[in-house]
Curated annotation (Swiss-Prot):
Domain PNT, chain residue ranges per copy: 168-251
DNA-binding region: 320-400
Gene giving rise to this polypeptide: Gabpa
Localization per Swiss-Prot or TrEMBL: Nucleus
UniProt-recorded Gene Ontology molecular function terms: chromatin binding; DNA-binding transcription activator activity, RNA polymerase II-specific; RNA polymerase II cis-regulatory region sequence-specific DNA binding; transcription cis-regulatory region binding
Job description of the protein: Transcription factor capable of interacting with purine rich repeats (GA repeats). Positively regulates transcription of transcriptional repressor Rhit/Zpf13.
Entry GO terms, CC: chromatin; nucleoplasm; nucleus
Protein name: GA-binding protein alpha chain
Organism: Mus musculus
InterPro entries: Ets_dom, ETS_fam, GABP_asu_N, Pointed_dom, SAM/pointed_sf, TF_GA-bd_asu, Ubiquitin-like_domsf, WH-like_DNA-bd_sf
Length: 454
């Protein structure tokens, strides 16, 4: 700790007793060499007197005569830090000044108490993608103040930057997964999706020394590797392994909790020490065309039939994405009153935005869903290549992705099929007086067959 850092130590309070800030004069009187300031981890509920036993083997000297103080306030060696006012839990890192000068009372003076990163908090709410919330995905290591108030600062700028990088990397790939329809759980990844993940992490962290052929495996094979096996395949894969662990912890948390809850993962995610380069000034967008092309083409579901269980019909990894839901509504002839295509270029309009939001809420079991939340979720897509807002047109959005490549049908084809389906339904109603069910398969087959005959 430098003199300046010592001058900036915050005020603390122990059992109601305040200790004023260290002044420059007091620091001069207690000058110590860097060798006399050591770091030591200790459990917050362990008697603080055990600090001597922990330090004696390291310092190779007896500390029996040393009192234990916290910024010059004497502590009871038989009581824990928690019992003496440090309101946190788990293991903390102490910065201890060892004072053994002749003519001075020997003591172990705790200068800082640092809470290490032990938990990963996940905000599970795909309808509210806020950077502020996602910044807490990886808990920042914090300097603890003993009055339990707001005085929380990061350990250092470097530590803060790296924590932020990991949080951004987790959220960044979550966006990539949703944008490309990649399952959240790595165990369900295909070989191409594993390679896409490797390339994304390499670009995100400016890595150049990873051999892609070593991870030309499926997601199930990837997740079956333990840490030792992984490093045998990827000798410099600390960052890859840490990122994979974060993704897997996120999946575990999302499986255990309902949406829109903050959950804490009990087991720590080990961020393996590695040199994480600082973020580059410009954001690199990773677009893997091969991963897109590998998507399975799906026939459109054009119907108006009742859904037996709207809450259980899902997309990748058991979760339907918002863009998939909107596309489903756009291929439902009975939903044209609330949402419909506009032209043939992928534009669509929410004719009844609150009704669309209500339907989305029913699908996701979120009764409080409204258009404000839905539009916030749609804005999440704007920085990708899936959906954008059409400027100057209220409630009008556009699929900017290549739907033909994605699902096998263009927006124009989907629009035409839906209109034909609606017209045939009306014709049947006029002939029979009631609406007869028209299946999507039959309609699509008839339409395509007619095209071939022409």
């Amino acid at each position: 700790m430098t003199k300046r850092e010592a001058e900036e130590l915050i005020e603390i309070e122990i059992d109601g007793t305040e200790k004023a800030e260290c002044t420059e004069e007091s620091i001069v009187e207690q000058t110590y060499t860097p060798a006399e300031c050591v770091s030591q981890a200790i459990d917050i509920n362990e008697p603080i007197g055990n600090l001597k036993k922990l330090l004696e083997p390291r310092l190779q000297c007896s500390l029996d005569a040393h009192e234990i103080c916290l910024q010059d306030i004497q502590l009871d060696p038989d009581r824990s830090l928690f019992d003496q006012g440090v309101k946190t839990d788990g293991t903390v890192q102490l910065s201890v000044q060892v004072i053994s000068y002749q003519g001075m009372e020997p003591k172990l003076n705790i200068l800082e108490i640092v809470k290490t990163a032990e938990t990963v908090e996940v905000v599970i709410d795909p309808d509210a993608h806020h950077a502020e919330a996602e910044a807490h995905l990886v808990e920042e290591a914090q300097v603890i103040t003993l009055d339990g108030t707001k005085h929380i600062t990061t350990i250092s700028d470097e530590t803060s930057e790296q924590v932020t990088r990991w949080a951004a990397a987790l959220e960044g790939y979550r966006k990539e997964q949703e944008r490309l329809g990649i399952p959240y759980d790595p165990i369900h990844w295909s070989t191409d999706q594993v390679l896409h993940w490797v390339v994304w992490v390499m670009k995100e962290f400016s890595m150049t020394d990873i051999d892609l052929t070593t991870l030309n495996i499926s997601g199930r094979e990837l997740c079956s590797l333990n840490q030792e096996d992984f490093f045998q395949r990827v000798p410099r894969g600390e960052i890859l392994w840490s990122h994979l662990e974060l993704l897997r912890k996120y999946v575990l948390a999302s499986q255990e909790q309902q949406m829109n809850e903050i959950v804490t993962i009990d087991q720590p995610v080990q961020i393996i020490p590695a040199s994480v380069p600082p973020a580059t000034p410009t954001t690199i967008k990773v677009i893997n065309s091969s991963a897109k092309a590998a998507k399975v083409q799906r026939s459109p579901r054009i119907s108006g039939e009742d859904r037996s269980s709207p809450g259980n019909r899902t997309g990748n990894n058991g979760q339907i994405q918002l863009w998939q839901f909107l596309l489903e509504l756009l291929t439902d002839k009975d939903a044209r009153d609330c949402i419909s295509w506009v032209g043939d270029e992928g534009e669509f309009k929410l004719n009844q935005p609150e009704l669309v939001a209500q339907k989305w809420g029913q699908r996701k079991n979120k009764p409080t869903m409204n258009y404000e939340k839905l539009s916030r979720a749609l804005r999440y897509y704007y920085d990708g290549d899936m959906i954008c807002k059409v400027q100057g047109k209220r409630f009008v959005y556009k699929f900017v992705c290549d739907l033909k490549t994605l699902i096998g049908y263009s927006a124009a084809e989907l629009n035409r099929l839906v209109i034909e389906c609606e017209q045939k339904k009306l014709a049947r109603m006029q002939l029979h007086g009631i609406a007869q069910p028209v299946t999507a398969v039959a309609l699509a087959a008839t339409s395509l067959q007619a095209d071939k005959e022409i």
